Regions:
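Intrinsically disordered, low-complexity protein-interaction/activation regions
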Residues: 1-145
Length: 145
């Protein structure tokens, strides 16, 4: 069983055990894909999010290396199938894991109180999703602290 946690920080668990990533960029790449909920992310878009101030050719080369490291790392845990790579884009297969973010936005009552106002705080790009989550929390539970 794969569980992806996005509230109060991004982490991935397999059968209740925290998995480790080969680098912070590999972890962030997976976080971006989880945030996109199965939609594909182009190489250019991922490059911008992970390497905003790096020359494009260098950034794209770095990204390819990061993807392969991420895939190899996930293979060690037997969960590499969550990654989907097509020419020039990346995605995740959302059917293969449970995610607090997904369950929360779908209104699953077991996840309604897990959101405490923090969503992947280690990534600046995740801030854009916070207002949406806070509004949902208010809808489900009343006022957010």
């Amino acid at each position: 069983r794969i569980f992806v946690k996005t509230f109060d920080g991004f982490d991935v668990y397999v059968n209740g055990k925290l998995i480790y990533f080969p680098s912070s960029k590999a972890k962030e790449m997976l976080a971006v894909l989880v945030e996109k909920r199965g939609s594909s992310v182009s190489l250019s878009q991922m490059t911008y999010l992970l390497y905003e101030n790096v020359e494009e050719k260098t950034a794209k080369n770095n990204l390819r290396v990061i993807y392969h490291r991420l895939r190899r790392s996930l293979e060690e845990y037997g969960i590499e199938k969550i990654l989907i790579k097509k020419r020039g884009s990346y995605a995740v297969d959302t059917e293969l894991f449970v995610c607090d973010f997904y369950e929360f936005i779908e209104g699953n009552p077991d996840y309604g109180t897990l959101f405490s106002g923090s969503y992947m705080p280690e990534y600046s790009w995740a801030e854009d999703t916070l207002p949406y989550l806070k509004n949902l929390y208010r809808k489900y539970n009343g006022v957010l602290k």
